[in-house]
Amino acid sequence: MNCLYVFNPENDMALADGKASYTPPARIRQMRQELWWLPEWWADEGDIVWNGEDKLNLPDETRILPWGWSTALCRQLRQAGVQESLLPSAEKLEHIRQLSHRQTAVALLQELREQLPLDGHFCGESTLCRSEEEVRDAVGRYGEAMLKQPWSSSGRGIRKIQAKTLSNSLVKGASSKEQGEVSLIVEKFLHKVSDFALEFWLDGKGGVEYRGLSLFYTNERGAYLGNWVAPEGQKLAWLAQYVPLSYLQEIRRWWEQRLRSFDYEGPVGIDMMLAEEGICPCIEVNWRWTMGLVACLLAEQGRYGRMVVEYIYGHYAAEVEAFG
């Protein structure tokens, strides 16, 4: 079965908007236009990588693998000529949208910490707030916190705040509205040592495949900068400087078991953090492709180095730089 790959980096913003007519900001449109070819790094012979413009005439058995699913992408594919039988239903799209809401990560972090205490080495707390009063209460408990919108990624829709500087206007500006009420995640601020993630693939029938460990780095605003593309053993050895590997194995086993219960087919990336306070085993749950998964696929090809996606001289570029 051949695949159609689509790099649509605006996916999280399209989920936040929720409408089929969504148009992303100009900078994100530029990223998609200039990096549409990215799936060529892992596509097999006979697969198609869509540039977002060409008309499509796909065989009925084609498997469509976008960066992420949204009603906006489905509309684009229909306009390109893709038959309805190859697209997810409206119900499935809404299910993916709700899974992608940060409330999923909030609930799973609490569940994991209750079931897998790891001798007190875990850290991280987050609260889903449905009113401005709940936001103020949560920030007051944490003292220093991150405000996060329900659907956002790579530093967008995220703001650091201290209890003493929290104002009504700031809460209103940071919040999104769902059915007329405030929706905002308040996350206790952690002093980061390193970002990492576990990458999985779910088959939609209870099967969970572990695809690898992702070591990635971001700027001070949380925007993605790049990944370390290396053998799994090297990545584990680096993390072992900071945390016992037995802890990582327990965390991985917990996620493998927990993910079996979700009605979902496709990639899942669990963003985590090594912090001065301990290990946070769930910062975000990405129900889509991630650069971490791409790095794992490149490592399987033996293309080791530093994978970077950057905006330079007014254009986007992606490459794997050899280790110096």
Where are these regions (language model features)?
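N-terminal-proximal low-complexity accessory segments that begin disordered
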Residues: 1-40
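Conserved N-proximal alpha/beta basic substrate-recognition cap immediately N-terminal to
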Residues: 28-140
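Extended active-site and interfacial segments that coordinate phosphate-rich ligands
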Residues: 30, 166, 210-234, 288-290, ...
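ATP-grasp fold ATP-binding core
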Residues: 109, 129, 139-160, 175-192, ...
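Glycine-rich phosphate-binding loop of ATP-grasp-fold ATP-dependent ligases
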Residues: 125-128, 144-170, 196-197, 220-238
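Phosphate-binding site of ATP-dependent enzymes
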Residues: 143, 166-225, 273-281
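A long amphipathic alpha-helix within ATP-dependent nucleotide-binding catalytic cores
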Residues: 222-277, 316-324
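C-terminal active-site "lid" helix and adjoining low-complexity regulatory extension at the edge
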Residues: 241-246, 279, 287-324
